[in-house]
Each structure stands twice: as C-alpha cells, then as structure tokens.
Amino acid sequence: ELAEKVGKKRSYISRIESEEGNNIQFKTLKDVVEKGFGKKLKIEFDEYFKNQRYSFTIPIRLIGTPFQIKCWEALQKIKYGQTISYKEEAKNIGNEKAYRAVANANGKNNLSIIVPCHRVIANNGNIGGYTGGIWIKEYLLNLEKGEK
C-alpha cells in the first residue's frame, strides 16, 4: 500500500521503513521489491554487490540541514573504489577545518551505499566510523576493491 503510494505520487525515495506505531507498513518485502522504484532499487543493489554497478540512478531526495546536504552531495562525487579523508571532504565543501562536522553529517546519512559515506576514512588512513558498523564499512570498501 505505502509502496504504491510512494511510487505513484513521488519521483524519489528518501527512506523505506516500517512505522508500526503510525500504522504504516509494507505487507511483505516482496511488495516493496516488485513495485515501481523497489524493483529498480533491487536490481541496482544486486548489480552493485556483483561489482557490476558503480553508481545508482534511483532518484533520491536528501533531507537534512543545508550543511548535511552539502556533505552528502560531496559524497556522491567520490568514485567507486576510491576513498578520501574526512578532512578532504571538508576541503571539498569549502571548509577544511570542519572535518569533525563532516564526519557527524556523514553519520546522519540515511541513504548509505547510495550516498557512499563508507568511502570516507580517517586522515591517518584508519577506517574511521560507520553508523552501520565498522565491519559493514570494511566489507563495502573491500567489495569495491574487488576483494569481497
């Protein structure tokens, strides 16, 4: 029901979630995957995890503060398999000293993988943080290097 509404009324996806408290839920994951954007999203994720897709074409709408959106737009410019530091990302948005704020903004990215915050690492070469868990960030970086 919700998947149909989102697919028909909007040209973007910002989040797929179940909000049981508000009585908004998908009946099954199959409902999401087989309809509209969900089908295309599944295809693109399958391709990504097979190293056959290097960027996503799913329309998205970034929802956040102007600073967060600026950070997330910068993330979308980082090429598949490439990493940059939080400091480099801060420099790319015009404020080299804001690397901690950049890291904080990246941590609030709700569209990880599509908006690839996993490609940003600490200035010293360490992996840095990742809201989904460090092991997921490591997996994604290794996947993009072809090392699964």
Cite the ranges covered by each PLM segment.
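DNA major-groove recognition helix of helix-turn-helix
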Residues: 17, 106
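…primarily DNA-binding HTH/wHTH and HhH modules…
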Residues: 123-148
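DNA major-groove recognition helix of helix-turn-helix/homeodomain DNA-binding modules
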Residues: 26-42
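Short coil turns linking two alpha-helices in DNA-binding domains
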Residues: 9-12, 25, 98
